[in-house]
């Protein structure tokens, strides 16, 4: 691919990436609000779970969220810049050392818990308080 084509492609991708989502990593518990179309009406459905993997590839970036629903593990892959994602909220920061948390698939109950990163939680709380004072 020529240099000109690469720059054109990069400019196109930059234009398509419109909104910023909060920063999250593997091990974080997130709530993804997804737009669901049923018939002629549209509603927002919350999907809460643990981020077990991310793929950073520009416009094709994606992340996988795993939750336990009625005793069964359910995973869903979301395209980061998709129009069906209404918003993403980080509930808690997890402290993990692995890049992909696929080992959680084989664990259940208390064994599948992830330690909370208290330093990151305190830092986020301080940032929220500073933003509140600024307003």
UniProtKB/Swiss-Prot annotation:
Origin superkingdom: Bacteria
Family: Belongs to the bacterial ribosomal protein bL19 family.
Molecular function per GO: structural constituent of ribosome
Originating species: Xanthomonas oryzae pv. oryzae (strain KACC10331 / KXO85)
Gene name in the database record: rplS
Protein name: Large ribosomal subunit protein bL19
Functional summary from the UniProt entry: This protein is located at the 30S-50S ribosomal subunit interface and may play a role in the structure and function of the aminoacyl-tRNA binding site.
Record's keyword terms, sorted: Ribonucleoprotein, Ribosomal protein
InterPro entries: Ribosomal_bL19, Ribosomal_bL19_CS, Ribosomal_bL19_sf, Translation_prot_SH3-like_sf
GO CC annotations on file: cytosolic large ribosomal subunit
Entry-linked SUPFAM superfamilies: Translation proteins SH3-like domain
Any one Gene Ontology BP term: translation
């Amino acid at each position: 691919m020529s240099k000109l084509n690469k720059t054109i492609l990069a400019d196109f991708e930059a234009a398509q990436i419109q909104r910023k989502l909060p920063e999250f990593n593997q091990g974080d518990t997130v709530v993804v609000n997804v737009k669901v179309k049923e018939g002629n009406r549209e509603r927002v459905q919350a999907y809460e779970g643990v981020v077990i993997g991310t793929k950073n590839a520009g416009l094709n970036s994606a992340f996988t969220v795993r939750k336990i629903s009625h005793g069964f593990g359910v995973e869903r892959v979301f395209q980061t810049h998709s129009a069906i994602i209404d918003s993403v909220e980080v509930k808690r920061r997890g402290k993990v050392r692995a890049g992909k948390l696929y080992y959680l698939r084989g664990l259940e109950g208390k064994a599948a818990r992830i330690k909370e990163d208290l330093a990151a939680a305190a830092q986020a709380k301080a940032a929220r308080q500073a933003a509140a004072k600024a307003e």
